[in-house]
């Protein structure tokens, strides 16, 4: 099952023609797409503290757009509507190997992932029968690929559970899990923390054997157009991302006071989530090529990237 997007056909003719604005005195513009969840904390800090504006030497307008899936972000990047984006590794690999003109400028976060269940009879993937549904955020999402990795290891076939999958947003999947509409959900923070507050929800099986704690989850992307034609804007985004991560890592209580508003929880609860050992914010986390190679070998992508350098900018290396 190849997940490469047909949207990239003819993509070389798409996009905005941009030139450096710093020398001309014009106002630069950058449009940034992101999703939701604890993994996007650096983006929240960047937005709240105006860090791109701070790191750009000139006038710049930053537009923030929240989208609900990696496929939607890929469509925006392919059309040239989006300049910078953050999303899971898997849709990035699908997009970049299909020809979407962008590169990874760094990893954003690692987050804990768990396969949760409400069914006491499920202790491993071998216990999941054909009638048991598993919610993942999207087909081709990193959660889908992590489940496929576990299926390959335990069942011998990365696609063994494809017919069990239903695509739901993380919040909707959590609601379905708690109500019994699905038997399992493979999800991430903070939804694993919220779901496990319920007495009937437990972890079905660990993912550590296929995706160790600290491996990358969310990556930051920049369009080739912006990277090549507006290097000052690109550098401001990179510097702002690093500054946001430094702020989170060095000022956790202050960061929790900002981030708690996004999830509508107390600062104390947010701080507890952030201090989970699986919650890491760093621009050079491992795992990107491991996932790329797995996806190519198991028909989730049409090919693997030629090299890590071929799909990244210097700030990611």
What is the predicted role of each segment?
Residues 29, 36-66, 72, 78, ...:
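Short, polar/charged alpha-helical segment
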Residues 90-91, 159-162, 166, 170-258:
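Pocket-lining segment of extracytoplasmic ligand-binding domains
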Residues 29-51, 114, 118-194:
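Bilobed "Venus flytrap"/periplasmic-binding protein-like clamshell domains
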Residues 26-31, 54-66, 81, 154-168, ...:
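A local structural motif
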Residues 25, 94-105, 152, 194-208:
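Ligand-binding "clamshell"
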């Amino acid at each position: 099952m190849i997940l490469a997007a047909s949207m990239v056909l003819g993509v070389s003719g798409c996009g905005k023609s941009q030139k450096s604005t710093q020398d001309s005195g014009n106002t630069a513009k950058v449009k940034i797409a992101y999703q939701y969840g604890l993994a996007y904390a650096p983006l929240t800090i960047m937005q709240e503290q105006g860090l791109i504006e701070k790191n750009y030497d000139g006038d710049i307008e930053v537009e923030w757009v929240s989208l609900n899936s990696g496929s939607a972000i890929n469509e925006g990047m392919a059309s040239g509507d989006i300049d910078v984006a953050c999303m899971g590794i898997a849709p990035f690999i699908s997009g970049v190997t299909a020809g979407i003109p962008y590169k990874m400028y760094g990893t954003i976060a690692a987050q804990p992932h768990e396969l949760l269940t409400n069914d006491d009879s499920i202790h491993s993937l071998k216990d999941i029968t054909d009638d048991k549904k598993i919610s993942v955020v999207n087909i081709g999402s990193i959660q889908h690929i992590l489940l496929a990795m576990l299926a390959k290891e335990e069942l011998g076939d990365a696609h063994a559970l494809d017919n069990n999958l239903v695509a739901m947003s993380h919040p909707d999947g959590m609601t379905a899990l708690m109500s019994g509409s699905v038997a399992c959900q493979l999800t991430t923070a903070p939804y694993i923390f919220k779901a496990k507050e319920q007495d009937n929800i437990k972890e079905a099986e660990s993912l550590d054997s296929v995706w160790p704690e600290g491996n990358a989850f969310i990556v930051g992307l920049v369009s080739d157009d912006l990277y090549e034609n507006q290097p000052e804007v690109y550098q401001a985004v990179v510097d702002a991302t690093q500054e946001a991560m430094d702020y989170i890592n060095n000022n956790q209580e202050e960061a929790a006071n900002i981030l708690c508003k996004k999830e509508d929880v107390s600062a104390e609860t947010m701080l507890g989530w952030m201090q989970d050992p699986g919650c890491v914010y760093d621009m050079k986390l491992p795992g990107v090529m491991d996932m790329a190679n797995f996806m190519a070998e198991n028909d989730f992508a049409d090919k693997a990237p030629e090299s890590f350098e071929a799909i990244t900018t210097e700030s990611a290396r």
